[in-house]
């Protein structure tokens, strides 16, 4: 019972870190990156579909992304979706593919993106702590119902705290890495 609760909590914490990693990867760093476009969707036959599924995305240069739709009729929709996104880029359509020049970030924009990265990291840490709280409640329930002894539950709580600290540290490292990428000129 205790092992199950700890395993479940660790699995959920792992997912929270993965979500944080994905969230942080969508923050633009001033370098071209195909992941920048993972959250942009277009209406494709009535379904919101990510453009990463509708086109090949290549990075031939550090500040240039080339998007080649699998279907030529999606060119205009993809261009519009990118232009309307919060990426702050201006795509150019040459009739066969879309070129996106990634502009240099201003100092002010870098600071803004660092704040955004820290905020996403904090949200992920709150998520991990909520998972810990729920697991602690489960451990207290197990103790109360007599399914495990006081010592066993105490050890499990220490293990849970250690695991929580480990995942919070991972999130801090992700944010620190992203901050370094953003502030690098």
From Swiss-Prot:
Residues 144-164 are annotated as: Disordered. The keyword Cell cycle does not apply. GO terms for molecular function: ribosomal large subunit binding; translation termination factor activity. InterPro entries: Ribosome_recyc_fac, Ribosome_recyc_fac_dom, RRF_sf. It is found in: Cytoplasm. SUPFAM superfamilies: Ribosome recycling factor, RRF (SSF55194). GO terms for cellular component: cytoplasm; peptidoglycan-based cell wall; plasma membrane. It comes from the Bacteria. Keywords: Cytoplasm, Protein biosynthesis. Pfam families: RRF. CDD domains: RRF. One of its GO terms (biological process) is translational termination. The keyword Secreted does not apply. Responsible for the release of ribosomes from messenger RNA at the termination of protein biosynthesis. May increase the efficiency of translation by recycling ribosomes from one round of translation to another. Belongs to the RRF family. HAMAP family: RRF. This is Ribosome-recycling factor. The gene is frr.
């Amino acid at each position: 019972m205790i092992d199950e609760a700890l395993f479940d909590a660790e699995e959920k914490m792992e997912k929270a870190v993965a979500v944080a990693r994905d969230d942080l990867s969508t923050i633009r760093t001033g370098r071209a990156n195909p992941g920048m476009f993972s959250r942009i969707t277009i209406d494709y036959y009535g379904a919101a579909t990510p453009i990463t599924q509708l086109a090949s995305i290549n990075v031939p240069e550090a500040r240039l992304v080339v998007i080649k739709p699998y279907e030529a009729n999606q060119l205009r929709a993809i261009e519009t979706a990118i232009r309307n996104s919060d990426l702050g880029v201006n795509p150019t359509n040459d009739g066969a593919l879309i070129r996106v020049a990634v502009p240099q970030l201003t100092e002010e924009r870098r600071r803004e993106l660092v704040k955004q990265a820290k905020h996403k990291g904090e949200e992920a840490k709150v998520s991990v702590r909520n998972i810990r709280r729920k697991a602690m409640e489960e451990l207290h329930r197990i103790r109360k119902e007599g399914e495990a002894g006081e010592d066993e539950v105490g050890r499990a709580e220490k293990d849970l705290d250690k695991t929580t600290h480990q995942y919070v540290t991972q999130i801090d490292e992700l944010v620190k890495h992203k901050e370094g990428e953003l502030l690098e000129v």
